[in-house]
Amino acid sequence: MKVYIETMGCAMNSRDSEHLLSELSKLDYKETSDPKTADLILINTCSVREKPERKLFSEIGQFAKIKKPNAKIGVCGCTASHMGADILKKAPSVSFVLGARNVSKISQVIHKEKAVEVAIDYDESAYAFEFFEKKAQIRSLLNISIGCDKKCAYCIVPHTRGKEISIPMDLILKEAEKLANNGTKELMLLGQNVNNYGARFSSEHAKVDFSDLLDKLSEISGIERIRFTSPHPLHMNDGFLERFAKNPKVCKSIHMPLQSGSSAVLKMMRRGYSKEWFLNRVERLKALVPEVGISTDIIVGFPNESDKDFEDTMEVLEKVRFDTLYSFIYSPRPFTEAGAWKERVPLEVSSSRLERLQNRHKEILEEKAKLEVGKTHVVLVENRREINNQIVGFEGRSDTGKFIEVACKEKRNPGELVEVEIISHSKGRLMATTKGN
């Protein structure tokens, strides 16, 4: 039997799709890249914005037209969590609905017709399904916490993923060792508030924090690099930043989700920090790690965002000069505080602001790329590049998170760490050769 999985959204969803495949492999399902040949089609959904939800029902309609006569369609993930049985009403071709915290129950629901499984289980026994058999890969996703206790006014995640619980460190270390023995060189640690790790366990455990976990993971033989997403700026205190800077295996790239550069908007968003506080954290980080790569999220058009508020966001963009920007127009979500507000920034205003923000960021990337020429980086080889079956190089990421295309006729295997020199750039992209060539 064959299964096709369409994955939308964040890294947590990618990890959930891996889990779905692992569970289904026990039932002799094999993954296929062609939905027309699948016996089971799964759509792993995202509900952070409205656009992916609209896309969901369009995809369901397309899959219903092309699927095999007896093939089933299942909807999983965050949209499944908050819409539940309403999905079955809107899309009769769907056979079952499986929430974001119910992935391990896929083997139960595929044999039921019109099943809905979205209830959240907070018992520690649920940890057993956080780890599962994974195929060998250089870069592995590793969950360290589930859920979110923050109450940001715009965000539906606490409703779809449940309250925040940290996975016991001994279980995480055991899984990381297994991944290392299977060839993993880089870990990507996952959590909705990943750097708040240790704030709450579902039962009594020794007091540890995120920095403690990073140090322990760094001791595992075979693990060369550690990244993590998504942290919250509130938990980036001096102690964390200092240990982040000192740990040689922790990559010197970090996600710092700003959301808005306006203190007034940040207060409405319930983010818990101000523009000045955020800039102070960036200043402290850059003092410790001058070459650090910083990515961020920015929402434009949040209710009541004024022209002055948006200019504050542009000011932060200029001061920080983010290496990566994920930017969106505000999307009202159900089960959120802001979703009930009547105030709305006109779409044409929001669209204009987004365009200006993104255009300026593209310019910043080009300016930063020029400064990279002549610099050296150590790249973890992710993929070989071939033309007409001839090796022409490889691609991968630097310690600071820069994606680099490397020209090299020598065979370099995925997982190798290679020193390269930047020789050119184009539209923010970096090209390099191996050091000494």
Curated annotation (Swiss-Prot):
[4Fe-4S] cluster 2 binds at C148, C152, C155. InterPro entries: Elp3/MiaA/NifB-like_rSAM (IPR006638), Methylthiotransferase (IPR005839), Methylthiotransferase_CS (IPR020612), Methylthiotransferase_N (IPR013848), Methylthiotransferase_N_sf (IPR038135), MiaB_methiolase (IPR006463), rSAM (IPR007197), rSAM_horseshoe (IPR023404). Its EC number is 2.8.4.3. PROSITE patterns: MTTASE_N (PS51449), MTTASE_RADICAL (PS01278), RADICAL_SAM (PS51918), TRAM (PS50926). It is an enzyme of class 2 (transferase). It catalyses: N(6)-dimethylallyladenosine(37) in tRNA + (sulfur carrier)-SH + AH2 + 2 S-adenosyl-L-methionine = 2-methylsulfanyl-N(6)-dimethylallyladenosine(37) in tRNA + (sulfur carrier)-H + 5'-deoxyadenosine + L-methionine + A + S-adenosyl-L-homocysteine + 2 H(+). It is found in: Cytoplasm. Binds 2 [4Fe-4S] clusters. One cluster is coordinated with 3 cysteines and an exchangeable S-adenosyl-L-methionine. [4Fe-4S] cluster 1 binds at C10, C46, C78. GO terms for molecular function: 4 iron, 4 sulfur cluster binding; metal ion binding; N6-isopentenyladenosine methylthiotransferase activity. Its cofactor is [4Fe-4S] cluster. Residues 134-367 form the Radical SAM core domain. Its main location: cytoplasm. Gene3D superfamilies: Methylthiotransferase, N-terminal domain, tm_1862 like domain. GO terms for cellular component: cytosol. SMART domains: Elp3. Keywords: 4Fe-4S, Cytoplasm, Iron, Iron-sulfur, Metal-binding, S-adenosyl-L-methionine, Transferase, tRNA processing. NCBIfam families: miaB-methiolase, MiaB/RimO family radical SAM methylthiotransferase. HAMAP family: tRNA_metthiotr_MiaB. Monomer. Belongs to the methylthiotransferase family. MiaB subfamily. Catalyzes the methylthiolation of N6-(dimethylallyl)adenosine (i(6)A), leading to the formation of 2-methylthio-N6-(dimethylallyl)adenosine (ms(2)i(6)A) at position 37 in tRNAs that read codons beginning with uridine. This is tRNA-2-methylthio-N(6)-dimethylallyladenosine synthase. It comes from Helicobacter pylori (strain G27). The gene is miaB.
